């Protein structure tokens, strides 16, 4: 298993925030490889954050997790979800509903944060995913809800640029050298 994942053999590995591999087998393989070699794989939170609370809730019980993404119609251009009518619509329109795994197979570079969040919570097959086209919208708005009886977390992150994804890598790198980790 480790031969195909050489990056984990030479130290800790920090994948880019665009983790977009919904395959549970791949996830298990790299996890086992890191374990065999005494390494850790650090997944930056990218554009969303909140992996700690998602993981905590999922550890407490069978979490119900949903992921809602709002995007401008221009950002959907060139994808299977794009329809020309989205450019002239005056109201928000749902263009996808399914699992995070299904969403990433259709839009691997547009909703990659959903896979990272689903790995931290209920799993790609179990996260309920919806994508909406919003007229005139610039950027992305991601709303993640995870809940079990007695506990509910809602994360709502809007960003007009992808700069937050790069800074999430900086945050992970700082944690690697800091005596206090957030």
What are these regions (language model features)?
Residues 2-10, 17-40:
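Rossmann-fold NAD(P)-binding glycine/threonine-rich loop
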Residues 10-11, 63:
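Short acidic/polar active-site loop segments enriched in Thr and Asp
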Residues 15-20, 45-47:
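Short strand-turn motif at the edge of the Rossmann-like AdoMet-binding core
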Residues 39-182:
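Active-site-lining helix/loop region of Rossmann-like oxidoreductase modules
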